[in-house]
C-alpha cells in the first residue's frame, strides 16, 4: 500500500502539471500586423486562465489541508483521491475552450456550461473523498476537532450545489459565469 507521503507527492505533481498546462490554453495571436488589437481580443482567454489558476491553486492548498487532517490512508481513499486528481488535471481543457469561446464570442454559453459541469464534478469528487475520510472519523487524526470536521463536511458538501448553480448562470451569460467562478474561488480563500 502507498504511504501517505507518497500519495501527497504524487498529488502535488498532478496539481503542478495541471496548473502549468493552463498557460497553454491561451493561444498566441495568429496575425501580428495589429498585435495590440490581437492581444486585447485575447483578454477573455487570459481571464479564464487567471480564474482557473486561482481555482487550482486553492484546490492545492485545500488538498494539503485535508491531508493534514488525515492520519492514514487506505485503498478506497487512494482511488477517491485519484478521481479528484482526474478532475483537476482536466481543468485546462474546459478552461481553453471557455477562454477561446469568450474571445471569439462564439459558443460561449455552451463552453461556460462545460466549464461549470467540470467544476461541479470536481466539487463532488472533493465531497466524496472528504466524506469517506471523515465518516466515523475513519482516517482522521484524533487531534482534529469534531466541530472543525462538521464545518469541513458542510463546506465540502455545499460546494457541489454552489458549482451546480453556476450551470444556470452559464446558460444566461458566459461572462457572468466566469465572474461567478471567480467569486466562488475568492470565497474559498
Regions found by a protein language model. Name each.
Residues 11-14, 78-88, 150-159:
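Select subsegments of transmembrane alpha-helices in polytopic membrane proteins
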Residues 26-31, 54-69, 89-103:
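Membrane-helix exit/interface motif
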Residues 114-137, 159:
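Alpha-helical transmembrane segments of helical membrane proteins, especially in multi-pass transport
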Amino acid at each position: 500500500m502507498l504511504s501517505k507521503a507518497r500519495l501527497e507527492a504524487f498529488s502535488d505533481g498532478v496539481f503542478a502539471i495541471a496548473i502549468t498546462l493552463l498557460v497553454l490554453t491561451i493561444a498566441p495571436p495568429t496575425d501580428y500586423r495589429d498585435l495590440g488589437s490581437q492581444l486585447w481580443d485575447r483578454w477573455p482567454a487570459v481571464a479564464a486562465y487567471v480564474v482557473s489558476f486561482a481555482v487550482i491553486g486553492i484546490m492545492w492548498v485545500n488538498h494539503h489541508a485535508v491531508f493534514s487532517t488525515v492520519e492514514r490512508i487506505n485503498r478506497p481513499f487512494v482511488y477517491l483521491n485519484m478521481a479528484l486528481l482526474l478532475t483537476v488535471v482536466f481543468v485546462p481543457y474546459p478552461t481553453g475552450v471557455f477562454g477561446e469561446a469568450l474571445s471569439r464570442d462564439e459558443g460561449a454559453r455552451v463552453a461556460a456550461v462545460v466549464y461549470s459541469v467540470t467544476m461541479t464534478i470536481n466539487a463532488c469528487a472533493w465531497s466524496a473523498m472528504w466524506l469517506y475520510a471523515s465518516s466515523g472519523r475513519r482516517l482522521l487524526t484524533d487531534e482534529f476537532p469534531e466541530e472543525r470536521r462538521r464545518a469541513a463536511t458542510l463546506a465540502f458538501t455545499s460546494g457541489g450545489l454552489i458549482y451546480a448553480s453556476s450551470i444556470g448562470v452559464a446558460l444566461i451569460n458566459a461572462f457572468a459565469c466566469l465572474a461567478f467562478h471567480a467569486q466562488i474561488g475568492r470565497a474559498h480563500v
